[in-house]
C-alpha cells in the first residue's frame, strides 16, 4: 500500500501515478463524518461516497431513489470529518 501522510491532499493524478508505479492504495466507503475522520487518521487514501447509501443508510431496496441532493449531503458529511478533503 502506498505510504500516506496524514492530511496530505491527493488528486486523480496521485492515483494515476500510484497505478503506473504498480503501488496499491486503500479505498473504503463512508457516508458520515465520524467514520471519515477515522479513515483519515488510519491513512486511507480514497473514501468513496456513492448511491449505495440508498440501501445501506436509507433502507431502500435499490439505489434508484437516491437523489443528487442525497449524495451531496453525504459528501459534505464525509468532507467535514476528513481534514485532507
Where are the regions a protein language model picked out?
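Alpha-helix-loop-beta-strand connector modules within alpha/beta enzyme cores
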Residues: 10-12, 60-85
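Glycine-rich, proline-tolerant flexible connector loops at the mouths of alpha/beta enzymes
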Residues: 35-36, 42, 46-72
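Conserved, mostly hydrophobic/aromatic
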Residues: 28, 32, 39, 78
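N-terminal amphipathic alpha-helix/helix-capping segment at the start of soluble metabolic enzymes
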Residues: 1-29
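Hydrophobic faces of well-ordered beta-strands that scaffold small-molecule active sites
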Residues: 26-30, 47-49, 84
Amino acid at each position: 500500500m502506498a505510504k500516506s501522510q496524514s492530511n496530505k491532499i491527493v488528486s486523480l493524478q496521485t492515483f494515476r501515478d500510484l497505478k503506473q508505479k504498480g503501488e496499491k492504495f486503500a479505498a473504503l466507503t463512508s457516508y458520515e463524518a465520524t467514520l471519515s475522520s477515522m479513515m483519515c487518521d488510519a491513512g486511507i487514501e480514497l473514501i468513496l461516497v456513492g448511491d449505495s447509501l440508498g440501501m445501506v443508510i436509507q433502507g431502500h431496496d435499490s439505489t434508484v431513489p437516491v437523489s443528487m441532493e442525497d449524495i451531496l449531503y453525504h459528501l459534505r458529511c464525509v468532507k467535514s470529518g476528513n481534514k485532507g478533503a
